[in-house]
Structure formats: structure tokens, C-alpha cells
Amino acid sequence: MTAKPPPPIPPTLGGDDSGTHGPKLAPEIPRINSELAAQAALRGQQLLRKQGSQEQHATNTLPAHKTGAPPPLPPTQSRPVPAIPARGASDRAAPPEIPPKRHSLKSMPDGQPMMVPGLPPTMRQPPPLPRKPASTQSSAQNSAQSSPLAGMKFKDKPPPPPEKHSTLSAEGMAARRCSNPFEMPPPPPPLVLQSAVAALSEQSSKNGLNPVPSPAPTRASEAKKINQRSIASPTEEFGSEDALRGIESGLRNMERAMQEQMNLRNMEAAVQNNFDLSFKASLAAGARHLGGGSVNLRTANYERNLSLDEGRAGDSRQSLEELKQLRAQAQQQSLLNNSSSSSSNSQVEQSMRSTIEHHMRSLDRNLPLELQYSRHRFQNNLNAVAAAGGGGGNSSTGNAVANSGTSGSQQPPMPLSSEFREQIRQQLLGNIPPQVVHNMGQSPGSAAAAALLQHQAQSRAAAAAAAAAAAAAAAQVAAGSGALSREELRMRRRSSHDETQLTQNSSGGIQVTRLREHWDETSQCVLQRAAQLKNMLSDSQRFEAKRLELEKWLARMEQRAERMGTIATTADILEAQQKEQKSFHAELHQNKQHFDIFNELTQKLIAVYPNDDTTRIKKMTEVINQRYANLNSGVINRGKQLHAAVHSLQSFDRAMDQFLAFLSETETLCENAESDIERNPLMFKDLQSEIETHRVVYDRLDGTGRKLLGSLTSQEDAVMLQRRLDEMNQRWNNLKSKSIAIRNRLESNSEHWNALLLSLRELTEWVIRKDTELSTLGLGPVRGDAVSLQKQLDDHKAFRRQLEDKRPIVESNLTSGRQYIANEAAVSDTSDTEANHDSDSRYMSAEEQSRELTRSIRREVGKLSEQWNNLIDRSDNWKHRLDEYMTKMRQFQKILEDLSSRVALAEQTKTSWLPPSSVGEANEQMQQLQRLRDKMTTASALLDDCNEQQSFFTANQVLVPTPCLSKLEDLNTRMKLLQIAMDERQKVLCQAGAQQTHENGDDGRTTSNSGTIGPLPNLGQSVKPPWERATTAANVPYYIDHERETTHWDHPEMIELMKGLADLNEIRFSAYRTAMKLRSVQKRLALDRISMSTACESFDRHGLRAQNDKLIDIPDMTTVLHSLYVTIDKIDLTLMLDLAINWILNVYDSQRTGQIRVLSFKVGLVLLCKGHLEEKYRYLFRLVADTDRRADQRRLGLLLHDCIQVPRQLGEVAAFGGSNIEPSVRSCLEQAGISQEAIDGNQDISIELQHFLGWLQHEPQSLVWLPVLHRLAAAEAAKHQAKCNICKEYPIVGFRYRCLKCFNFDMCQKCFFFGRNAKNHKLTHPMHEYCTTTTSTEDVRDFTRALKNKFKSRKYFKKHPRVGYLPVQSVLEGDALESPAPSPQHTTHQLQNDMHSRLEMYASRLAQVEYGGTGSNSTPDSDDEHQLIAQYCQALPGTSNGSAPKSPVQVMAAMDAEQREELEAIIRDLEEENANLQAEYQQLCSKEQSGMPEDSNGMQHSSSSMTGLSGQGEQGQDMMAEAKLLRQHKGRLEARMQILEDHNRQLEAQLQRLRQLLDEPNGGGSSATSSGLPSAPGSALNSKPNTLQTRSVTASQLNTDSPAKMNQQNGHYEHNSKNSSGLVTVITEQELESINDDLEDSSSSNTTNTTTTTTTTATTEKTCVELQK
């Protein structure tokens, strides 16, 4: 509940009184705060001194004291008045801006006196004012002027006139302060200032400050009427501080001031009345001695000049000084005349003074500090009074008046600006309630002051009689004084805060009385409002407490309601929910009374406080009531739902029993109806209607039962309910079948079934028409643009919609026909013609007609069913075909766009070619050309794809859009031009490089040594005569044996090394055999002396970081290897570099393209260098991981492919899963916890490092050779203090194998590798492998395990074989992942222009013919069976469902189906080409014989030796050149035929391998797959001994596959048992001529070779068919 906001503050209107003095003072007011405490102390000291003089004077008799001295105050008081504490600048709070209240001030005409009814006009002059002692006034003035504030603010101003003492009430003082801002405020009561000075002195003593001197204040009072408060002189200064501060703090200060006045009321009453009588009588007596005319005129003029107009400020100050002098003289005269007054007058005056000072002290609290003590700066006469009160209180009054007049003339009163006065007035009048009635037009502030004084006047009722005695004297004084004008009164009232000041001669009595009334009324209103606010606060607090309580309770109940959940379906849960609902509802009902109380509080606030804003209360109450209503309605609805659920559950059992009884009764009726159906057909109709009626009951019971079955928690109840439901369903279905059968029998008349037959025939015709329409829609070519395809899809949707509309009718007729023929006996399905031919329908019996009808219906049902199914299938196929065309067309257009951008980029690169100026630039441009070739290789693949897509569209009668065809044709042309341009560019660069090399006299090779440690050695010195090292255009080294005149890709040392590795083939187990071979290679290449950290640093130093997908050529590889080998001492650097390059090219670049991937280069070196095994695993994973340190399937496949190439080079790849890396990737992903569905779905999945390491710790089959290599290296120097039980070797060096079944049986590694056995030991026994010396703990452990194994039977070991590695099944797996070629993502270079490459291509097959080195069962040189299958899988086009072959059988079948026609076409082309060549050769021979018969013998001789034609003529030379070309062409043809024969042999070998795999039993899968031995996690060449002690080995579980034999032509292995001795021969021109005759002889056998190839292909087809079966 909030109170209404106060009205806004109206802007202050500036009048004429904004003179020159106002703007100077207003900004300086905030800066005088530091002087306020000092001013308060001065004022307090003055009052204390005055009080001391009064107390001293009170002890004497009244006639004894001097005239003009103030009457003494009572020596003691019953209760001390609290002092006003002095505040400093830091304690003062800035007064808030108080909005003004509307008030009216009635202005009076300027210059006219205000006439008060009942009072005589003011015509007399007031008595003269008593003069203060000069010393007192001067000391006060000096004290005030000594302040820096006083000197700053009141410089160059006249001194104020002498202050006139008067007895003013609190209302008069406040009114006078507000009406005259030029006057200084009066001093506070002495008791208050005494307390203030005491407090200030105590604080000063605490702070170490000197006490402030306290001047003695003096105040003169004038007599007034009885019941009226005297009005202060206009010379009195304005204001005190606490008026605004009290308003700022609110009603609290006012109540405190009123409480203090109530406490002092009893003491003040008598003293105040006596003081008023004596003081006012003396004023009246003194007034009679004053002269009338001039003084009254001057006083009236002064009163008229007291307006707030700043233009008349100077005249007003002059009049003020004169008036003060006159009044001081009059007061002095009156005091002299009244010297004989009684002592009671002194007591009355003292009482009145105490009361007035107390009121002033109360009102001073309500003003700010800036105004509370501002009067003391300008009231210089206070110093004189203080001096008089402290030292000589008996000084003459005349001197005091004279001194005060003198000091007052030095400094005039401070003028204030109109803005500042208006601000003070607004702040003083702000908090007065506007309801106060202003009878005389006074401001609200005056009414408040009058109300307060009225309350004080009631306490002085006892002094009313004494005050009446002095009324006459006061009336005479009032009659003698001049009246003020109405304009002056209006101006004074406008700037007043607490009370209105009138002159002494105005009718102030009536105004004061009204002020008292207004003050009482305002005080009463304020007190009422305060009480109302207290009550409002109390009610609001109760309301808020109740609201918070209810909101908390509602929130808890709402949460409880949300947790109730849905309605259950079981009895026990429903019962619990009902209890919960009832308790919830009961709690809602119990708390209803709290909401009633809350609503009562709300209504009370609204009714009791109608003038305040209660909108927020109403809204909060409505929200809470609405929440309660929602809760109540929700719980009632839930109760109804629970009741309905319970009722439904209870009625389910009854309904189930009733329905089962109905079924029993109906089944009995059906049995009876079957016999009596013909006599009483109406009985079946009633039965049928009853069954249809109970169909709804059955559906409801079945649905309810299923719901209950799903919600039951008890197993027994669920089983029982399931049985009842099954029984009900079965009996209902049987009843329906019986009903249908009876209905069919009733409807078995000819008309019904004839109508069914007719309907079936009509539907058949409709289906045939729709089939024809579908053929029309799908007939003809399909438009390949997107719009046409979308239109055809829309047509298909419309067509399918027609089929769906007809489907219910077709299925209904088919169902009826099948039911009819099912109930009839089986008859022959002869046609209608045959049936009519047998007999005429007119002579048929009813039984024969029924059989004929049945036969027709059966035939039509079968025909309609077949036609309908075919139509649906054709529609589905059309839809699938359109979707496929749409997808392929979009892909085709996308590839065209990509290809176009690639070709444009290549053409732009071509335009920037410049001729080379040096060898270095030629090499750099050659590298750029090579990169461009790589890019164009990808573009060529895309172009081939586009051409294949276009061929597919053409074959399927899909019209490709003309723009796409045009673009494809343009791209083909541009690609051919680019290829020609690149070939020409390569020739230019090669010629430039060769020319520069010849000029330099170099060996044909230039390298860049930047970034290496020292210059590169001359690698030509790596071989010794008769060998010579040469390089191709791609910097690929090859070696020439001048003794045998042959060339080799392998270094002579590498050939010897490979021959030496053949001796290790005697090792029985493939994992150890591979590890031994790799260890030999590692030592020969000195890679075991290069640490992995050195290799990684070298990679980074040469810029190979994050370049794994790029290519590295041989010069760069040489540079990196040189930086590694220079760190090793005592090696043949040139030989090591050549061997390392040779090994890496054999592993990763068998085609000798001269470039490999950076990833392959790094993997090949890291696998064989020295390092910790786990560190190698981590580094290998980092090579393929992305920025998030994760590797997907493709990256993992690339890594495993590069790793598997190492055993592949050694001919051991078949023992480790083959070249197919998909099973290993799948095994890794499954080990990482990825589901099989995610792997098969080709989702975007990846693994982290910990997954990869966890998989490798299980030692997978494809990488098991790597940890075995590390253990083998660690065991080379190990010596075991044991004796071999077979060869008796002691100590055992290397591996030590301890049998875990035979006690104290050890074997050395040699015996174990060769599979030797002892008498009692067998290969099936488990063994433990040690590569370091054993400990006693291990001995005890092995003995315990051996003891356990003694008690295990042979069946246990067969049932629990210990493979020792993680097997990977690869027989039934396809190559769905990327198995990159030797350079993935880059096609090998075509070195057609390289002489050595061409010679190698020709001679590789011719050498086989010459030496007969290859057998019929040899395998390919560069591919094993897995890689060949993988290549064919990638070459096969995708099937319609997008599934790739998963087994070798499927691969072979798909390969045969796709490649058969291609092979036959190649064979036919070769036969045709061979026939043409033979015909051309015969024609040439005939021409030569006819033209030169005498040289026929020479021609025959030339066929054997081309050197014999050197002396022939020009025509003979031409003929010889053509013959040479013909022979070369025949050689190429023969080589291609040989390749085809080799291809057929490859297929036969693969089929043989597949037959072996298919014939193997499932239990032998472990032996069919490869084998190896896993290592402990973290084993390495330099690992600690304790990491290599935990290997268990079973010899019978190890793979014993024989290794492939190496083909020495290119360093690869083949499965032929006999090594081939055929080498790559350099065929010169003379040698080609020498074998010409052999080629002529072999040309006649081309037809035979073709027949052999065809026969082999037929055999392959037959074998594939057998495998498929």
C-alpha cells in the first residue's frame, strides 16, 4: 500500500527583490557550514551570561535593579530543557526540496494601513528601546566580524540597528522570521544554549580545541494585549535552522517539540502570565511619553518600506535605522517611568522570557544550519550584551543603546535574493496539510505555527485574568502605532514559514489568535495523519505477512500438485492416488479460513484508507485468490478423474465376465445355426446383429486390457490378465469366422457370386488400363533437367493416388473371392473355352454350375491379384528410378561446376609460365608443373566421372540438358589442351635442365643443400664398378650393372639384404619372422641409432609439420635423411642415404613415381627408429589427428595403411590381415565403444588418443609385429641363467620361453622359433616369454601357474585357446574405407617421355620371354590378392542400393560381371590389331620383293640383323625403319597379351585362395588369420626391463603361414616358391633388331594366345558361378 505522491513543486517566480545582494549570498550559503558551530557557541555563551545576570537580579527586589535591565529568570527550574547540539559541516545533511502547498496571500494596496476591527488606529509612537552597553555590543560585534564568513559576506554593509527587545511567542517569532529575511534570527533560550555550549566545550576539550567565547544575549520585550502574543519588531532578524530540518525529518521532530512543551507547561503558566502583565504595562506607560506626528510618520514610512522589493532596499535600511533609534529612546523613557513597578512585573517578565525562549528553541530545530546561526554574524550588539552580562550587568541602559546604535550603524542587515527567500518559504511551507482552513488568508506555515501556539496557549489558561489588567496599556500602545499597508502584509506573508509578522502598531492580537487556531488544527491533522500512517503501517505489515505466508503455502501446494502425476490404471496405485487427492483437498479446505482473513485485511485497507492508492493490493489479492481457485478446481477435477478410473477398473472385470458369457452363448447359437440355417435364415440375421452390437464392447475391453497389462507391476497378475485377453481374442475371432462362414453360405446364390465375378473382371480390366497408362508415362526418354524430373515425380504422385483410392475395393473383392473359393472344393482351373467346349451351360445341373462359378472366381482372383501386384511394383520401380535420376543429375551438375573451376584455375596457371633462366629455376618450375599435374590428375578423375555419368544417362534414355553437354564437351577439349601443354612444358624444362647440366659438367643431378648440416654427399659414389647409379627425370635412382648390362631399381646392397632375409623364412611363426626381418633392415640402415626425437625435430626443421597430405620428392627426402644420418658416427653416409631412399621407395613408391606422401615418409622412419613404443603410438596418432585431437575413420585408415606397407614389403602382409585395413579400423572403433550401427551407417565418428592407445595395448593383429620388434631388440643383450631343454644352450641369450605346464622346462628363442619339441613338451602347452632376466617372484608365479595347468585337461585348452593378440576377421570384410595407393589422393606420374620408363615397360615382359623366369602360377609383382580385390572394389560402379561387397566371393562375382565384357573387347581389339599388322607386314614384304627381287635374300637377312641394311639405298632404309616400327609395335602387342595372361593367372590364384578360405572350418579361423605376439604396454627398444615380462605364448596358436617369395625385379614378394632371376634389362636398338625374327615367329601364335586367354576367362566365369552357388 503506497501513499499518494505529493504535488510537484511549482517554479519560483523571481520578483523585483532579486537585487544585487541575493546572488552574492546564495552560492556562499553551502560554504558557511564550518562556521555554524562557532556561531552556536557564541550564542550559547551570550545566553548563559544573560541567564546569570537574570538569576542575580532575581535575588534582589524589583525596585532595586536599574531601569532597562531585563527581569531575572527563576533561579532553578524543575526540569532542564534539552540543549540543541551544535552541528558542524560534516554532520549537516542537505535539506530536501519540499514541494510547495497551494496557499493564498491576500495583497493589500501599497501605502494603506491594515485596519483590524475592534482596535483603534495606530497613531502613537512606540516607546524608545533600551540601549545596550557599548562594551557588550562592541565585543559581540567584534566576535561576529572576526569570523572569515562575516568578513566575507557583510563587507561594505552598514551595521544593523539596535535590536528591540520584545516578548514574542513562537508563532510571532516564526512569522517574523519568514516575513523579513533581512533580519537576523533571535538567540535561543538560555537553558538550551547553556546545554549546547556545555556540549560544545566538552567536545572541544576532547578534540583539543579552545572553547569559543560566549557573548551574553539580551532581549527586550514589549507589552501586548491579554490573550495575544506580541508581534516582533521588524528590525528582528529572520529565521532559525531547525524549522526546515524538522520538516525534513517529518512529523517526528514536531511531536518531539510538542512533547517538550507539554513537560514544561506547568512551570511556565504562572510565570508567563505575570511577565506579560508587567512587561506590557511598562510598554504602554512608555508609549504615552513619545511624540506623535513625526515619529509615527517616520514609523509608517519605514513599515511601508519593508516590502521585499530590492529596488527600495536602501531606503528601507535607512528607515529601519531611524525607527530603531526612535524606539530605543521611547523604550528608555518608558522604563524610566515604570521604575516604581512592583516585583511581580519582574517575575512575569522572567516567566514570559523563559517561555518565549523555549518556543524559539523548539522552532530553531526546524530550520537548516545555514539559517539557524546566520543571525549571529550580523548581530554585533550581542557582543556588547554578553560583555554586560558577564562583567557589568549594572551598566546604564542609555549607554547600551548608544553603543548598539553606534555598532549597528557600521554594518547593515544582510539582504537576501528573491530566489533564496522563495526557496526558504517553499521549504518551510511544504509539509503543512492543505486541508487546514485559512480564515485570514495566511499561508499553511502560519496556520501550523498558530495551531502549535494554540496548543501552548491552552496551558496558560490560569493567567488569563492577570493578562486582562494590562489590556488597556497594550491597547494604547497599539492605538499609538501606525498601521502597515495591505501590500506590505501580503509580501511578508508570502515569504513566511511558521508565522506572520506585523508591526507593533498593527492589529496583531487577532492574527495571533487565528494563528493559534490554525496551528492547533494543523497539529491535530498532523497527529491524526501520523496515527493513521501508523495504523496503515501496522495493517500493511499484517497484510504483507499474511500474503507471504499464503504465497509460500500456495507454492508448496502447487509443487505437490505437479508431483501427483498422471492417472494410474491399476487398483493399488489408484487407491494411493485417491488418498493423496483427499488429503490434498482436505488441506485446501482447512486453509480456506486463512484466505478469508487475507481478504478481510484487504477489504479493511481499501475501506479504511480510501484516499490512498490500493491498486497494487487489489491485484495481489486477485492473483492469490485465483491461484487458490485454480488449485481447488484442479484437485476437484482430479478427484473426478480418479473416481472415473476406479469405476472403470471395477467395471472391467464385470464387463469381461459378461462378454465371455456372451461368447459362450453365441458360440452355442452358431453351432445350432449351422444345422438349422436353411430352415430358419432369420436366426442367423439376429445372431449377426448381436455380434455387430458387441463389437464395440470387445474393442473397449481389449483396449482397456492392453492398458492394464502395460501398467501392472505384479508378474502373476499380468500373466493372468494376458491369458484372459488371449482367450477372449481367440474366441471372438473364431466366432467371427463362423459368422462369416454362415454368411457366405447364406449368400451362396448365383446372383451374388456372379456379381462378384463381374466385379473381379471389371477390376482386372481397370488394372490393365492403368498398367498401359504407366507404360505410356514411362515410355520414351526422360528429360534430365530438374523441372522435367520434378514434373514426372508429380505425375507419379497423381498416378499413385489413383491406385491408393482403388486399393480398398480391390482388396475387398479379392478377400471375398478367396473366402468363397476356400470353402468350396478344389476344381480344375480350365479356361472358359475349355469348359464351354465340354458341355453346354443350359444342360448343366446346379452342382455343375456352382463348380463352374467357383472355377471362374478362382481364375479371376488369381489374375487380378497378379496384375495388381505387378502394377504396384512397376509404380514403385518408376518412383525409385526417377529419384535416382534426380540424385545423379544433381551430382553430375555439381561435378561439372567443380571441374570447370579447376580447369579455369589450371589455365590461369598455364598463362603465367615463363621460360627458365637457370637450372634452379628449371627445377623449381618442374616442381610447380608437377603440382599442377597432381591437381589435373584429380580433375581428370572428375572428368572421367562426368563422362561415365553421361554414358549412364544415355544408356538409360535420360536426356541430359544441352548446356551440360556443351560444358562437358568443352571441358574435355580444354583438358586435352592442358595435358598437351603440360607435356610440352615438361619437355622444355627437361631440355633446359639437361643443357645446363652438360655445361656444368655435373653428373646430371643438382640438389639444394639449404637447411642441411654440411653439403650433401655425392650419392653416385654409393656403388662401385661395374655398378653405376643413375636417376630418372623425377630424380628416382636406379642402378646399372654394366657387367650384365641390366638395370635395377634396387641398390646392390639392398639386393643382398633382401636375399639374406630369405634365410629367416625358416622361422615358423610369422610375427617373430617379420620382427627378425625388420630388425635386420633396421640395423643395416642404421635406423636403430637414430632416436625418434631427433627425427621429429628434423621433420619440423624442414617444414614438414602439418604437411601430411602433401607430397615429398626424392631430393627433399634426401635432405631430411642427411640431417638424421649426420648425427651418427662411423657410417658410410652415401651408402646409408641411398639404402634408406631405396627402402622407403620400395615400401611406399613401388611404381617409382618419385614422390610419396609426407605422412608415409614420417611413418616409415618412425616405425624403425629408436624410441619408446608408447611414444611412437602417440606420435603416429598426432600425425593423423585433427585440431580437436581426434581421428576419424579415414585418417585412421590412412595411418594403418602406411603401417601395413612395412610387412607387405617383406612379403608378410597376409599373416597380418592383408592390405585390407577396414577390419582393423572397425576393431579400433568397436574397442572405443562405438556401436556397430554407427560404424555401418558411415556416420561422422572419431576417436581420441586414449581410445587408440587402449586398442593398441590389446596388440591388434595388423600391428602385432611392431611390439614384437621392440621386445626382440630389448632381448638381444639379455642373458638368462637357465638351460635350454632342447639344444642344451647355457646361458640362454635373447628370448627365454618357460613352459607353464611342464615343470622346469625352458627353451631358447632359436628352438622356439623353429618349432622344436621335446619328449613331453608339445606346441599346445602354454608358455611364458621373457626378454629380460627373471626374478624370484616371477619364478614362484610361473611354478604356481604350471601346477594349476597340470590339473587342467586337454579339452580345457582346446576350449580356451590363448591367441595372444587381438584377432581381426578379414575374410568376410570388404574395403569400404579408403585404401590409398602408394600415393593417396595423387595419381602416379605418367613417365611416357622418360626413356628409362619406356624401356622398363617393354623389357619387363620381353625379359620374361627371353629367360622364361615366370611360371603359370605366379602372382602380380606389385599387388597381393587383398590389394587387387580392393582396387576392383573401388573400380566397380555402385549398385542400386549403394551397398559395397563385403566378402571376396561377392568381390569376385562383381568383378567378373563387370570386367568380362571389357576383357573380351580388349581381346577382340588385340586380335583385330594383330591381323591388321600381319596384313600390313605381308603387303610391305610383297612390295619389297616385287620392287627388288635381287635383294630378297638381303631382306631376309635383315630380319635377323638390322646392321646389314646400313649399305642399302634410301628406299631400303625407309623400309627398314618401317619394319623396325612394326616389330616394336608387335613387341608392345605381345607385352599386352602377356599382361592379359598374367591377369588371368591372378584371377585363378585369387579363386584358389578363396576356395581354401571357404573350405576351412569355422573353428580354424584363428589359424587362417594372421598371427603375432602382443607386447606389454609401453615396451620399446630402450624401455625398462619390468615392462617386458608379461607375455604368454601358445605355439599352436601362432601363425605358421609361409612367407611370399621376393621377386627380384622390383624388390616385392610373390607367392611363388621359386625365385625369379629375370631382371629389368636395358634394351638397345640393336637388341631390338636382333629379336625381330623371334617376334615374327611369335606373331603367328597370337591367335592361339587369344584362344588361351578366352579359355582362361571362361574358366574364371565357371569358378565364380560355382562360388556363388
From Swiss-Prot:
Residues recorded as bearing Phosphoserine in the entry: 1379
InterPro entries tied to this protein: EF-hand-dom_pair, EF-hand_dom_typ1, EF-hand_dom_typ2, KCMF1/Dystrophin, Spectrin/alpha-actinin, Spectrin_repeat, WW_dom, WW_dom_sf
Membrane topology: Peripheral membrane protein
GO biological process: actin cytoskeleton organization; establishment of cell polarity; imaginal disc-derived wing vein morphogenesis; imaginal disc-derived wing vein specification; maintenance of presynaptic active zone structure; muscle cell cellular homeostasis; muscle cell development; muscle organ development
Spectrin repeats: 541-643, 650-747, 754-883, 890-990
Cytoplasm among keywords: yes
UniProt-annotated binding residues for Zn(2+) 2: 1299, 1302, 1321, 1325
Name of a matching Pfam family: ZZ
Tissue: Expressed in neuronally derived tissues, mainly the CNS and the brain of stage 16 embryos. Lower level expression is seen in the sensory organs. Expression is absent from the musculature. In larvae, expression is predominant throughout the neuropil and brain and in the eye antennal disks.
Presence of the UniProt keyword Repeat in the record: yes
Location of region: Disordered: 1-28, 43-243, 327-356, 389-417, 481-508, 827-851, 994-1024, 1488-1516, 1559-1669
CDD domains found in the cross-reference section: EFh_DMD_like, SPEC, WW, ZZ_dystrophin
Subunit structure: Component of the dystrophin associated protein complex (DAPC). Interacts with Dg, via the Dg WW domain binding sites.
Protein name: Dystrophin, isoform B
Gene coding for it: Dys
